[in-house]
Curated annotation (Swiss-Prot):
Negative regulator of class I heat shock genes (grpE-dnaK-dnaJ and groELS operons). Prevents heat-shock induction of these operons. NCBIfam families: hrcA. It comes from the Bacteria. This is Heat-inducible transcription repressor HrcA. Disulfide bonds: none annotated. One of its GO terms (biological process) is negative regulation of DNA-templated transcription. HAMAP family: HrcA. Belongs to the HrcA family. PANTHER family: HEAT-INDUCIBLE TRANSCRIPTION REPRESSOR HRCA. The keyword Transcription regulation applies. It comes from Nostoc punctiforme (strain ATCC 29133 / PCC 73102).
């Protein structure tokens, strides 16, 4: 059920979250009066905090303590309260420009990596992961890219035996994919003449290379084959189905290595004081990367392809048990409009959401630019 807050409740929830993020200590009304220009008395703040607690947005760790945000409180903070007008209510006016400043910092840092003489994409991603961990103060996660946007370099149809041919596809990264196909749709009298088949397959191969070289495999999977010329038409139906199956099989996202940086610093924070919790998180990062990859690499809906989107999962919103007390912020980086990898940060729910979201968004945009640079 969606919680409707008054302006005063919003401001006090915002200040409580900000103060707890900064101090890691339960927040009392006196601290908010001293640190934030809320324009109300300490008694009023206590009353409002009590209402927020009853709504499930704050809670008391123990009876004599102040209050801390719940997962639901953080969710409202992220979805509704991170706005310039609310940030400007802080005594410290630097909060109002922190997002823009951090965005520029990561842009400058990543631009420096883009100018390296060693223009290896893997080297760039390693550097980006370290920068992301440093600027966010979180564990950084960057997945190695998918081959979903590989371009067709060469296509060849080869007769293997009577009635069977092999389709061979070579991508711009020199990866080879093949599929064995049955020639049963072709008239029997043609199948019996092996030389005729060889000549026709070469003609079709040449024709397809001329018209399709340089296209992405995604385009091939969705190609309107009926637009191609007459030389192709006699082989049309089975090639259409076979190429579509081959390219879709190649395009299916598969878990890739996740580059992880910043673990030791984050795990020193008070939220990770329990050794068993630390061990389960490290095990996930090192031994269960497939599960984590499926969580941070999101295939967009067709209407969202090409759009930048940052996903924030807070606490129990994470389906993986080891990180159900953590926040995971992630976004895809793209080649053109197609997502090929993900960038993210993992930290306690008590993290600087404004900064972390800005850093992840900037990193994803720059990795998209870099991927196009290294793979024009």
């Amino acid at each position: 059920m969606e919680v409707q807050l008054t302006n005063r409740q919003q401001h006090i929830l915002w200040a409580t979250v900000r103060h707890y993020i900064a101090t890691a200590e339960p927040v009392g009304s006196k601290a908010l009066v001293e640190e934030y220009d809320l324009g109300v008395s300490s008694a009023t703040i206590r009353n409002v905090m009590g209402v927020l607690e009853k709504s499930g947005l704050l809670y008391q760790p123990h009876a004599s303590a102040g209050r801390v945000p719940s997962d639901s409180g953080y969710r409202i903070y992220v979805d509704q309260l991170i706005t310039p007008s609310l940030r400007s209510r802080s005594v410290s006016q630097t909060d109002a420009t922190r997002t823009e400043t951090l965005g520029r910092e990561i842009e400058v840092a990543l631009q420096k990596h883009l100018q390296w003489e060693d223009r290896s994409l893997e080297t760039l991603l390693q550097g980006a992961a370290q920068i992301l961990a440093t600027l966010s103060g979180c564990i950084s996660l960057i997945t190695m890219p998918q081959t979903t946007t590989a371009l067709l370099r060469h296509l060849q149809l080869v007769q293997i035996e009577a009635g069977r041919i092999m389709l061979i596809v070579v991508t711009d990264g020199y990866e080879t994919h093949s599929k064995l196909m049955d020639l049963s749709p072709i008239p029997e009298e043609t199948q019996r003449d092996s030389e005729v088949i060889d000549r026709e397959l070469q003609i079709v191969s040449n024709f397809l290379n001329t018209h399709l070289r340089g296209r992405s495999l995604l385009e091939l999977a969705n190609l309107n084959w009926s637009e191609l010329d007459q030389e192709f038409q006699r082989y049309g139906e089975f090639l259409k189905n076979s190429v579509a199956e081959l390219t879709r099989r190649t395009l299916a996202p598969t878990a890739t290595q996740i580059m992880v940086r910043g673990v030791s610093e984050v795990l020193r924070q008070p939220e990770f004081s329990q050794l068993q919790q630390v061990q389960t998180i490290i095990h996930l990062l090192e031994e269960e990367q497939d599960q984590l990859w499926r969580l941070i690499f999101e295939e967009p809906e067709p209407e969202d392809i090409g759009k930048s989107r940052v996903t924030v999962r807070i606490g129990a919103e994470n389906p993986l048990e080891p990180i159900r007390t953590c926040t995971l912020i992630s976004s895809n980086y793209r080649r053109g409009s197609i997502p090929v990898g993900s960038v993210g940060v993992l930290g306690p729910t008590r993290l600087d959401y404004e900064s972390a979201i800005a850093v992840v968004a900037s990193a994803a945009d720059y990795l998209s630019e870099a991927f196009s640079y290294f793979n024009p």
